[in-house]
Amino acid sequence: MKVHVYTGGKRIVERSGVGRAIEHQKDILRAEGVTVDGVRFKDADIVHINTVLPDSALAAMRARIMGKKVVYYGHSTMQDFRNSFKGSNVLAPLFWRWITFCYNLGDVVITPSEYSKFLIESYGVKVPVYAVSNGIDLGFWKADKEGRRAFREKYKLTDEEKVVISVG
């Protein structure tokens, strides 16, 4: 199976959570033996799309015309869009219509939580929506005795003092 992970607009999202999600998707697909590296759009069996930018919607339409399956990732909701910048609340109803249109271009939508699944389904998206956590890179977040020692030394913490760390 060959998968093309569409990266149009990557410069806009590469430093965001969406950019990291794209890299995680590629890593997981590779680990499962799926060919993702160097797969051209026209040669793919499946196209994965991560943004609701206009070029992504066009890519989804092109894929469907070519008979390819489309996996659309539901990273965006109207609720997240609201209050994100001055005037966003005025644009939110248009954004809702746009993302509903985009998500309906997929054969399935994958979103990171049950809450976002509920929201996306409530918009009237007609294709199946699945909640699948983005997960974390366990290789990066593994126990490291030297790192632990350096952290405690830097913050002047004894081995007996408890430390609570939050990520997310």
Where are the regions that the model predicts?
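A short helix/loop element that forms part of the nucleotide-sugar donor recognition site in Leloir-type
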Residues: 142-157
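Membrane-proximal helix-turn-helix segments that form the acceptor-binding/catalytic region
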Residues: 65, 90-109
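Short N-terminal targeting/anchoring amphipathic segment
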Residues: 36-55, 69-73
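Active-site proximal beta-strand in glycosyltransferases
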Residues: 46-48, 62-81, 108-110, 130-131
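Acceptor-binding helix/loop patch of EC 2.4 sugar-transfer enzymes
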Residues: 8, 68, 72-97, 139
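N-terminal subdomain of nucleotide-sugar transferases
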Residues: 1-41
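Conserved donor-binding/catalytic core segment of Leloir-type glycosyltransferases
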Residues: 158-168
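Carbohydrate-associated surface elements
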Residues: 115, 135
